[in-house]
């Protein structure tokens, strides 16, 4: 069931000092300055002494067709010497004089008490006489340069545009996060990632992604020995990793036992050593030819290998610049990105506090 539009009461106080309209004559006969026209659920028409709060005061010199324009609210009035017509609905068959509204802060007497109130003042000139037929036919198409008449009327055209908009395929908005992640990848990884996005989702996509990554890295670093199936080489790598972790742990314990006067406290934490050891044991093909090294408080690197999204706690954080290939210790804390860089034949793992591009 269609809901009826709610009507708001509008109070218009016509001020006709000359008494040329019916409103002015009634006000003079009652010795009052205003004639109130109330439009809403009910209609009222009476002379009054002063306007009410939030009312419209329409000052007119005589008969005319007046249209009060107050934002979304439009009030159309026909004031003649013998009658009054007013509406808040559309009334387009007649011409009207548009009257703008000026809000004013005033003091008026309301219900026997003087109160502060806002009234809206508007002044008409009487340049449009009542009931002048509007010569513009809304159904007639004017002759406009560069404009042709459509085969549809306005309602049909709006419905047609809406149907086309709803039936058109909607483009899926891509998330910004993959684009953001690609900024932290090296050229090889970004290329593989773009190729993987074109593949169909599912287990086959993951399998193809792994194969593509393996092929790209083998082409880029062909000089590395990729024979990883030999048992003796795997055992040798594991022993080297364990020796590196043991050396790092011994250095860390020696630094803690030494006094602060003789040796300053190191920024290498136990959590960092454990995280580095786990990364070394992953046997990443990009790091197989590099030996692990501990980063000093500041230094440089030769190239950025890759940046991974890893959440580490209580680790040294570095600010590094890819353009100058320098890094500097900032503090010890938590991070979400870890950069893998190389210096000579050493692998350095830097936790990113932030980076300058």
Curated annotation (Swiss-Prot):
Note the superkingdom of the native organism.
Viruses
Biased-composition ranges for Acidic residues? 230-243, 250-260
Keyword annotations from UniProtKB, A to Z: RNA-binding
- One family from Pfam that matches here is BTV_NS2
Q: Which family does it belong to?
A: Belongs to the orbivirus non-structural protein NS2 family.
Listed name of the protein = Non-structural protein NS2
Q: What does this protein do?
A: Single-stranded RNA-binding protein.
Q: Give the Gene Ontology MF terms in alphabetical order.
A: RNA binding
Q: What are the boundaries of the region Disordered?
A: 162-199, 228-268
